UniProtKB/Swiss-Prot annotation:
Pfam families: Ribosomal_L22
Matching InterPro entries: Ribosomal_uL22, Ribosomal_uL22_bac/chlpt-type, Ribosomal_uL22_bac/org-type, Ribosomal_uL22_CS, Ribosomal_uL22_sf
Underlying gene: rplV
Assembly, per entry: Part of the 50S ribosomal subunit.
GO-annotated biological processes: translation
One annotated GO molecular function: structural constituent of ribosome
Name of the protein in question: Large ribosomal subunit protein uL22
A Gene Ontology term for the protein's cellular component: cytosolic large ribosomal subunit
Amino acid sequence: MAEQISSARAEARTVRIAPRKARLVVDLIRGKSVAEALAILKFTPKAASPIVEKVLRSAVANAEHNYDLESANLYVSEAYVNEGATLKRFRPRAKGSASPIMKRTSHVVVVVSELND
């Protein structure tokens, strides 16, 4: 008998937001139900909120479409942000020198699982 899959995941790779800033948003939704997590993200005034919301909605859609899971029974079991590639730029400074600018990118991962009743 095949084992029932009870979780689905979604990723957004190389998103142009610093991982440190994205982690502040991801920490708010970890362990919450999907409906509660979406409500939190909607009213969080951070640049990472729409990005994380899009990944969460994608994970829910993957769960419904690929594994026939009910969205009402889902919760955010894992949510984390890893560091992506860093774009290195330089800002001209006084006396012909330059200062480095690190434009950091993130890999956002959200895993939703079914609640075990």
